[in-house]
């Protein structure tokens, strides 16, 4: 729980998502921890000013490790949406995306990639079922399954932007909008200790299937007010691991 001391024999994860360029105005301050996880939508539109402001704020936080993935609002991070309305070539568009990603200097950015922090294996991916013309959209079914099949089976903490179906995904339109394929991969193959996500602001909170704890860490509510508190959890420090690396 918030306020509990950080233990020497555990890795403290602090989870946020969907801060939408309001991370400096969060109603609940971000507590210290070993690892800060941001599950995407750290901007409103993904422009460079927003990215720079977010990166600068991350630099003020004390966490030794900061891991960030993109969400559907990071339009400049996806070559498909970065090209909307532009006449650039594919190569030029890809270079523009690479340049904006390099502006995140105070964190580890994961896009279909893994990182090991304090001996704990983390995997991050930004994709979600198609939603209007936002970034990192894929059709439900095989296209998304292909992405989730890249998740290593030894993942301890999975970070995606979309929720899996049935966990933190209940929308104000009275329906579950999470990803079926993601739930199947999480429950039947990967079985991580924790699955952290956001995207559905009204789905904030934690659930469990008895094996994995599902964490919707969306900070903003449906009116984009940064009212929710960060969610923290501790993972036992793996044998032989150190918090110094």
Residues covered by each model-derived region:
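Active-site-proximal segments of metal-dependent phosphoesterases and phosphodiesterases across multiple
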Residues: 82-91, 131-135, 153-191
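Core catalytic region of metal-dependent phosphoesterases/phosphodiesterases
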Residues: 16, 21-117
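Acidic, histidine-bearing metal-coordination/catalytic regions of metal-dependent phosphoesterases
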Residues: 1-25, 61, 80, 234-245
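A Trp-anchored, charged/polar loop motif used as the substrate-binding/catalytic surface
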Residues: 104-110, 137-149
